[in-house]
Amino acid sequence: FSGPVENVAMYANSEYCTPLQGFIDADSQGWPELESTWEAIRTAYCDNEGNQVGYPVGYSYPGIYYNADMLAEAGIDPKEIKSFNDLYDACVKLVEGGYTTYGVGFHPDGFYFNAALGREGLQAYNNNNGLGSERITECLYTKDTKVHDAIYNMLDVYQKLHAEKLCVAYGSDYQAEVIPQMASGDCAMFMGVVSMTTKILDAANGAFEVGIIPMISATEA
């Protein structure tokens, strides 16, 4: 399966698919490559009894694509963009320096929100963010100081970027909304997933070097 948990659930007990667990049990040599996969991903592809119902192919990993030529011209080292605060500083320099119209493009999706927290080993909700058999029952924003401070800092940066017109939001139609802006030079960076790589390279068409930064953290921690 490739997709979110709810997509897997639609097929897990249908007559169209055979549960993968039987094949796993028959494999006497084990599945070492799966054992090294992030445990939360594995859990998301199991039923409530812990039996695996699918293999998570095509899983998305987030990062920030950037116009390497533009950042170099602005004197910005992409390796130093490690947090939301660093991203804000880079956007200020890019926009106020006249290098581009928008510093970064954002997709306001919880996936990126949780990924930024995950860079610091934090989760916004209890019970492993609901990835196991136990459902989420509590938001940790008001219960855990580290979670509160990380979320507050991240949302504060979001707010400043929008208020100061340093960023542009995009939705699910990223190929029409943000990739053309980056290809034209109107946007220096955008937050996306690795599956977007070919599309941005095709859009840039060699006009500039495209780079990608691993997902940044919510704070400087």
Predicted regions, residues:
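Extracytoplasmic/periplasmic solute-binding protein
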Residues: 44-57, 62, 88-140, 187
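A conserved catalytic-core signature of glycosyltransferases
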Residues: 59-61, 66, 177
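Stable alpha-helical elements in mature extracytoplasmic
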Residues: 4-7, 16, 20, 67, ...
